[in-house]
Regions:
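An accessory alpha-helical subdomain
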Residues: 187-195, 199-234, 239-254, 258-259
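Catalytic cores of RNA-modifying enzymes
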Residues: 1-209, 256-264
Length: 264
């Protein structure tokens, strides 16, 4: 099993580098917890893995019989994976997951990854815009709160709205800081999301952009934030939303209804 401290240290010595803090490299060394998460995943035939590192998750995913496209930014780790984890169902791509064209992988597909903490939000947004069948991510616990945040909460934002409208989300497992090398000094959780059967027919990218616009001045009134829309007053009236309502208090379903009527 690759998710252990001995394998990780040996791999680092082999490629002659130290974990890159700038790339958010913290390697999971708790194989038991990781395997438990993978066993509970509902995966499509094609899986995109973000940041495979030394292949701890990759190995477990391949054991599930899926085809894996692994996107890794670190060239040394790409070489390591190609040398040590050759498999007919694995393609390792050297690239930036933020710039990767998720639509280039045949649908339906799932996305799995141990996400770099410093780009968790933009990376999750990029993935959700591609609307995978399922999305499983190891993230900092504080970042995970954004998926589940409710209106009026400080962490409530576009990521909360899109997650709750398009996915059924849950925490699969908690990972204390000692589950990683080097120790990140923060607790992490593995979050699982499966696409809802009643997910909106609106493109997630469009709704994400609208929610971002709406919440850019979260303490302002909804009328102020919609001043670019000439039909805003009629739409607010139709939805019985008082114009003095603050955007941060609106439920995801209300924001979806606003989008649909404003763009009708």
């Amino acid at each position: 099993m690759r998710a252990d401290i001995a394998f990780t240290k040996t791999a680092l010595e082999r490629i002659g580098v130290k974990p890159n803090k700038a790339l958010g490299q913290n390697f999971c060394i708790d194989g038991k917890r990781l395997a438990s998460c993978v066993e509970r995943m509902t995966l499509a035939e094609n899986v995109i893995e973000i940041g495979p590192g030394f292949g701890a998750l990759t190995e477990l995913l391949l054991e599930r019989g899926v085809t894996v496209t692994a996107v890794e930014k670190d060239e040394a780790m790409v070489r390591f994976l190609n040398e040590t984890l050759s498999h007919p169902n694995l393609a390792v791509i050297c690239g930036d997951a933020l710039k990767f064209r998720y639509g280039s992988v045949p649908a339906p597909f799932s996305v799995v990854g141990n996400l770099p903490y410093y780009i968790t939000t933009p990376l999750c947004a990029a993935v959700q815009k591609a609307l995978p069948e399922s999305f499983y991510a190891m993230v900092q616990k504080e970042a995970a709160d954004r998926f589940f945040a409710k209106p009026k909460e400080a962490s409530y934002g576009p990521l909360s709205i899109v997650t709750q409208l398009y996915y059924d989300a849950a925490v699969l497992e908690s990972f204390p800081e000692e589950c990683f090398y080097p120790n990140p000094k923060v607790a992490s959780v593995f979050v699982g999301m499966t696409r809802r059967p009643d997910a909106p027919d609106v493109a997630p990218a469009k709704l994400f952009a609208f929610a971002t616009e709406l919440l850019s001045m979260r303490r302002k009134t909804i009328r102020n934030n919609l001043k670019a829309y000439p039909n805003a007053d009629d739409v607010l009236n139709a939805l019985s939303v008082p114009p003095e309502t603050r955007a941060e208090t609106l439920a995801p379903e209300t924001i979806l209804a606003l989008y649909r009527l404003l763009h009708a």
